[in-house]
Amino acid sequence: MNVILLDKIANLGSLGDQVSVKSGYARNFLFPQGKAVPATKSNVDLFEQRRAEYEAKLADQLAAAQARAEKVNALDAVTIASKAGDEGKLFGSIGTRDIADAVTAAGVEVKKSEVLMPHGTLREVGEFDIELHLHADVFANITLKVVPAE
């Protein structure tokens, strides 16, 4: 199925690209999320008329994400206190939601879907570098300190 992308999508393309994707991916993900429209003649014409509007919207989102990244990078280490045993093992774990809540409490709004944890949840006390994916082109890093709760 041929679609016109309305947003930049990793490993697929950017705004205005006409790409061929599987119909299930288009129907179940791209269309409901508003990231693409079918590449019919009328949609192609409509897209060309509204291209400047879409590009301006994308530029605004990028600028907002870059501003948030600067705020995140300006933060000192974010600290999370959690119950831990004598050897530094946590009772439970710290996941994306906990990190997003801690960064939001520190002053920068972050969603849990923006926190990247490729090695899984944190299960021990220590200092960790966490990467935040704020936009398709914008990444930020924070230092997370996990300390035992008193």
Curated annotation (Swiss-Prot):
Pfam families tied to this protein: Ribosomal_L9_C (PF03948), Ribosomal_L9_N (PF01281)
Residue spans crossing the bilayer: none
Name this polypeptide is given: Large ribosomal subunit protein bL9
Domain of life according to the entry: Bacteria
Keyword entries, A-Z: Ribonucleoprotein, Ribosomal protein, RNA-binding, rRNA-binding
Family that this chain belongs to: Belongs to the bacterial ribosomal protein bL9 family.
PANTHER family in alphabetical order: 50S RIBOSOMAL PROTEIN L9
Role of this protein: Binds to the 23S rRNA.
Gene Ontology biological-process annotations: translation
Matching InterPro entries: Ribosomal_bL9, Ribosomal_bL9/RNase_H1_N, Ribosomal_bL9_bac/chp, Ribosomal_bL9_C, Ribosomal_bL9_C_sf, Ribosomal_bL9_N, Ribosomal_bL9_N_sf
PROSITE patterns: RIBOSOMAL_L9
UniProt GO molecular function: rRNA binding; structural constituent of ribosome
Cellular component, GO annotation: ribonucleoprotein complex; ribosome
